[in-house]
Amino acid sequence: MMNPLIIKLGGVLLDSEEALERLFSALVNYRESHQRQLVIVHGGGCVVDELMKGLNLPVKKKNGLRVTPADQIDIITGALAGTANKTLLAWAKKHQIAAVGLFLGDGDSVKVTQLDEELGHVGLAQPGSPKLINSLLENGYLPVVSSIGVTNEGQLMNVNADQAATALAATLGADLILLSDVSGILDGKGQRIAEMTAAKAEQLIEQGIITDGMIVKVNAALDAARTLGRPVDIASWRHAEQLPALFNGMPMGTRILA
């Protein structure tokens, strides 16, 4: 039997009805023809940004990571574990998929500690207990997990969703796909790079070809590949017809090698 698969959703996917329709149609097709257990992990930067804008709150980033002051963590939790998570559950319901909404702290699935005081309520994710999610998977549910976590001291933390997905993949012994707006990592000429090693990534970062949020994504994928001891795919949701093959292990974007 294949390992479970974690599909991490990112970019504007949550903001686009067309993207969600393509994704959930592909999930329905895949679940009808394959037995592989699936888990969705999501962030929702665009949902948070819209909310912050509406509330006239500043968005600060440091090295591609969102700074989360104490007076903003409740708002961000509401956006990610509330709006973003329940939007995905609503799409699952619309497509007759039995889904369960979770956050990283449920069942202690992912352990979270504070990453850096300067970043505020931003968490570092580490593997936790697989019991709850395995139980849901065994009963045919699709877990949909937001990237909000909680420390042992009971502090809510905003966790980078790529890193949250990596920690959960390590917890479950699962494979990982990072789905976003881009078809993979592009070279300086806009061409997709099929495979990427750490050395190649460092070279492209030095050359300024991989920048900003993509640095965080590539580093998260490299970290994931090292942690999991197997390749991690960065791919796009745009080609819905290719998604079932991607979910089954066919490389469609950039395959990150440990």
Swiss-Prot record:
Which stretches are annotated as coiled coil?
A: none
Give the reactions, separated by semicolons, that this protein catalyses. Answer: N-acetyl-L-glutamate + ATP = N-acetyl-L-glutamyl 5-phosphate + ADP
Top EC class for this record: transferase
Q: What is its main location?
A: cytoplasm
Q: According to its record, what are the GO cellular component terms?
A: cytoplasm
Question: Keywords assigned by UniProt?
Answer: Amino-acid biosynthesis, Arginine biosynthesis, ATP-binding, Cytoplasm, Kinase, Nucleotide-binding, Transferase
Q: In which pathway does it act?
A: Amino-acid biosynthesis; L-arginine biosynthesis; N(2)-acetyl-L-ornithine from L-glutamate: step 2/4
| Biological process, per Gene Ontology | arginine biosynthetic process via ornithine; L-arginine biosynthetic process
Q: Which positions in this protein are listed as binding ATP?
A: D181, V182, S183, G184, I185, L186, I209, I210, T211
Compartment(s) where it occurs, according to its Swiss-Prot or TrEMBL record: Cytoplasm
Write one Gene Ontology MF term.
ATP binding
User: Which Gene3D superfamilies does this UniProt record tie to the protein?
Assistant: Acetylglutamate kinase-like
Pfam families the UniProt entry points to: AA_kinase (PF00696)
Q: What is its EC number?
A: 2.7.2.8
Residues binding substrate are G44, G45, R66, N158
Note the SUPFAM superfamilies from the entry: Carbamate kinase-like
Q: Where is the site described as Transition state stabilizer found in this chain?
A: K8, K217
Task: Give the family, as the similarity comment puts it.
Answer: Belongs to the acetylglutamate kinase family. ArgB subfamily.
> Which NCBIfam families does this one have?
argB
Q: Give the function comment from the record.
A: Catalyzes the ATP-dependent phosphorylation of N-acetyl-L-glutamate.
Subunit text = Homodimer.
* Matching HAMAP family: ArgB
Q: Identify this protein by name.
A: Acetylglutamate kinase
